[in-house]
Amino acid sequence: MKYDLIIIGSGSVGAAAGYYATRAGLKVLMTDAHMPPHQQGSHHGDTRLIRHAYGEGEKYVPLVLRAQTLWEELSTHNEDPIFVRSGVINLGPADSPFLANVAHSAQQWQLNVEQLDAAAIMARWPEIRVPDNYIGLFEMDSGFLRSELAIKTWVRLAEEAGCAQLFNCPVTALHHDNDGVTVETADGEYRAKKVLISAGTWVQALVPELPIQPVRKVFAWYQADGRYSMKNNFPAFTGELPNGDQYYGFPAENDALKIGKHNGGQLIHSPEERKPFAAVASDGSEAFPFLRTILPGIGCCLNGAACTYDNSPDEDFIIDTLPGHDNTLIVTGLSGHGFKFASVLGEIAADFAQGKSPAFDLTPFKLNRFTQ
């Protein structure tokens, strides 16, 4: 049997692609080295932010707005919502380039964003403390996603639609010829007209020339009472300290507030190097500078987890065909800010498999930007 599309890596983007391509009527095989959702990539830990006024650059805004529509559609397939509209407050110095990008994106795309000075931030959310020179940009239509529930839902819907699934089975090699692609796995060989490589952190095992640097990251839950919950209108947040360090976090659930540091981490070169939470001495205290400054009422660290970023050199996505092989799409380099886009990236991959032109300008995400 020859598939229309074989997906290598069925985490966030791959799971979405499997569903959307199967729904479009294609013969699809989803593969993964583990059983998605799993703990080996970047999608675990229950929740991920979704921001619309994008501080990483306005080139992402059309993608995230389409992603939002798809997330809301996906939520209709569950009793529990996948998207939670908590609002997101972006905090930082008034001269922060990140916040300038947020404001610019909001203006360009007429997004619902409110700017607050330091006094207004602390009046609305007394739990938050900020220096006098800080501002907040509040995205009231943004919030967070239940990441593992999303992947479970896509995998289930794809299977129900007739998608073949081969999990706990690593892909070991790809071979291109004039008639398509042969995908070698521990279970045997499979043939496809087109392939999506969405293998996350360890994509270089299949495509060694990709400029991807795996980074070990951690996030943790800290003791927090009901003041920090959505019942008290406490939002999700991003925060930049005066030294430039960037943090993100979520409203407390079950008396625990999740927070992580976006920058930093440990460079790694194999899965074995991604040690569990607390294996690095700084893991449990990484968020302390932010908590002491911005959220002084938060309590002790309860538990945490490690994940992996697949960083590109400029921390922008890579969405491109494999050089010399127009039948193989690569989605990688999501650099720790990709989950919110998983729905639209999966749709882009499904369009690719159908021979459709992308609905977005993907030029900023091409591989050739690293050689120009």
Curated annotation (Swiss-Prot):
InterPro entries: FAD-dep_OxRdtase (IPR006076), FAD/NAD-bd_sf (IPR036188), Me_Trp_Oxase_MTOX (IPR023493), MTOX (IPR045170)
Superkingdom to which the source organism belongs: Bacteria
Species this protein is from: Citrobacter koseri (strain ATCC BAA-895 / CDC 4225-83 / SGSC4696)
Keywords: FAD, Flavoprotein, Oxidoreductase
Residues given in the record as FAD binding sites: 4-34
EC code: 1.5.3.-
Family (UniProt): Belongs to the MSOX/MTOX family. MTOX subfamily.
Quaternary structure and interacting proteins, as annotated: Monomer.
Protein name from the UniProt record: N-methyl-L-tryptophan oxidase
Catalytic activity line of the entry: N(alpha)-methyl-L-tryptophan + O2 + H2O = L-tryptophan + formaldehyde + H2O2
S-8alpha-FAD cysteine PTM sites in chain numbering: 307
GO molecular function: flavin adenine dinucleotide binding; N-methyl-L-amino-acid oxidase activity; sarcosine oxidase activity
Enzyme class: oxidoreductase
Record note on cofactor: Binds 1 FAD per subunit.
Role played: Catalyzes the oxidative demethylation of N-methyl-L-tryptophan.
PANTHER family: FAD DEPENDENT OXIDOREDUCTASE DOMAIN-CONTAINING PROTEIN, PEROXISOMAL SARCOSINE OXIDASE
Lineage of origin: Bacteria, Pseudomonadati, Pseudomonadota, Gammaproteobacteria, Enterobacterales
Pfam families: DAO
